[in-house]
Regions:
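Basic/aromatic DNA-contact patch characteristic of tyrosine site-specific recombinases
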Residues: 1-76, 82, 93-96, 100
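Low-complexity, intrinsically disordered/propeptide-like segments
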Residues: 12, 19, 133-135, 214
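N-terminal core-binding DNA-recognition domain of tyrosine recombinases/integrases
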Residues: 45-59, 69-197, 216-219
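DNA breakage-rejoining catalytic core of tyrosine-based enzymes
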Residues: 190-212
Length: 236
């Protein structure tokens, strides 16, 4: 079964505050032609994002909108399970999804989510929830969507936004738990491999220089003899 195409869910903060869903026919169809929880979840997200837009910076709103939108699209179109029924295992599945999303959910640039046309706003066909960044000036390599992999920092930012979303819903008594907070502790993408870190040490030449200086200081002032003793002890 082919992966459903993703459609944008939320316009800019200014447009979202007083949104008229009739002006977004594709979005309206998605919410009306599916189970009733689609609409309620979208309204939860809208309420949360308006709260973020009112109290945080424009950058924070844009980042949270991206993450909440991805999560809701996965909930709607992939998992097909209400947010208040999701468990830790579901969230870990979402992490796997974000690690390797469907190719049709990946684009190469940042596009406007909605475009005006015929008196309404239509979802931009070039837009996708995930973006594969291409190095500037790299025109020799053909972009390969299958190589998309988010950094650990990107996944951490995603989890942070969704944790905040669930926390808001709990405070508003829409949800009773925060499965994302629990899942993050067991997410394999956040478990760091045990690595032997290079210990920074002075080279032999550097040590010799320090020792020579200490000797000179001790020769000129007996008060520095203790320093010479300590440095010599560290060296040996």
């Amino acid at each position: 079964m082919p992966t459903p195409l993703a459609v944008p869910l939320f316009p800019t903060y200014t447009e979202l505050k007083g949104i008229d869903l009739d002006a977004y026919p594709q979005l309206t169809d998605l919410l009306k032609q599916n189970e009733s929880w689609f609409k309620s979840h979208w309204l939860w997200a809208k309420e949360f994002l308006v709260y973020i837009g009112r109290n945080k910076s424009e950058h924070t709103f844009s980042r949270f909108r991206t993450e909440v939108e991805r999560f809701l699209l996965w909930t709607f179109l992939i998992k097909e399970k209400p947010m208040d029924e999701l468990r830790k295992s579901d969230i870990l599945e979402y992490a796997d999804f974000c690690w390797q999303p469907p190719l049709t959910w990946i684009c190469f640039a940042s596009y406007e989510k909605f475009l005006p046309g015929g008196g309404v706003y239509i979802g931009n066909k070039k837009w996708a929830p995930f973006r594969l960044k291409i190095a500037k000036g790299d025109s020799t390599t053909k972009p390969d969507k299958s190589k998309y992999r988010p950094s650990q920092e990107t996944l951490a930012a995603s989890f942070t936004a969704i944790i905040s979303f669930y926390t808001y819903l709990m405070n508003e008594e829409y949800c009773t738990g925060n499965p994302v907070l629990i899942a993050k502790k067991d997410c394999r993408y956040f478990i760091k491999d045990a690595q032997v870190k290079d210990i920074k040490r002075l080279t032999s030449d550097q040590w010799q220089h320090v020792l020579d200086v200490a000797v000179e200081l001790a020769d000129s002032d007996p008060n520095h003899e203790r320093s010479l003793f300590l440095i010599a002890a560290l060296k040996t």
